Every structure is written in C-alpha cells, then in structure tokens.
Amino acid sequence: MLINIKNKDTLTIDEFTLKCCVGKNGFTKNKFEGDNKTPIGTYKLGSVYYRKDRVNQPITKLKKKIINFNHGWCNDPKNKFYNKEIILSKKNKGEKIFRKDHKYNYFIEIKYNSTKTKPYKGSAIFLHLTKNFKPTAGCIAVDFDSMIIILKLLNKKSKIRIC
C-alpha cells in the first residue's frame, strides 16, 4: 500500500483522498534540521506509536509501540542517537513524544534519514495528527478519522511517496 502526498493539502491511499498538511516552508529535495520543510522522496514506514492512556490500540499491520512519559526523539545532530527514539534524560535530550496536546496520540515514523543517519539532514519526520491543519515543522499531519483509515490500510511493506 502506498501513501501518496500529491501536494501541500492532499493525501491519497487506496481509493481515499484525504486532507493533510505539510511543512510550513513546503517541500524540499535537500532537507536540513529546522528548515520546516517536508522531504521529497519515497520512504518506508516504521512503527506506529500511540498513547494508550488516550486512544485505543490501533488496528494496523504495522508494528505498534506504546508511548511512555519519558519517550523522546533525538533531534540533536551531535548526539549518536540523532533521529532515533530515545528515553529522555539529562544525557539524552530531544523532542518529547508524550505530549500534552493530541498530535502524537497516534503517529507513524517515516523512515527519512534513518539508515546511515546523516547529522543535520533532518529528524523526527512523522505522519501525525492535527485538528486545525496548520502547517507543520516538516511532518505530514491528518485528522483523527483519516489516521484511523490510513492505519487500517497499511502493512509492513507500505511506503509513503512525497511529491
């Protein structure tokens, strides 16, 4: 199954056309940390992460991971765990994925810059939730109902094609 991001506000999967939003500064073939752009390319999908205190276990064929209070994603290009899931500590700092808002109640890792990770080339690129469709820091976001549809359709061989 292929998720296709056709433009800044349209995602297609199977016979579904869904509303989405992308990075504030659009798309790029040359992503770097903090540019607020969504990376162009075709990428594998990683695990689906979810807050079991807020949402049900997702119905999907992807690997599922529960988000705990101390979970984070390393966005420090100088850290050996750059662009990896981490347990937050004084030593390992990063983006908190156990958030007060709803954005990461469900999210899917997009395997951008994940194999042979290159520092400063961008981190924490996810397909996550939104309520207002405001542009993101580089991720792709959909509403809750769309995420449920997407999760049900995906399998371990699924990919996402951005532009």
Residue positions per predicted region:
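Cell wall/extracellular polymer interaction/catalysis modules
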Residues: M1-A137, D145-C163
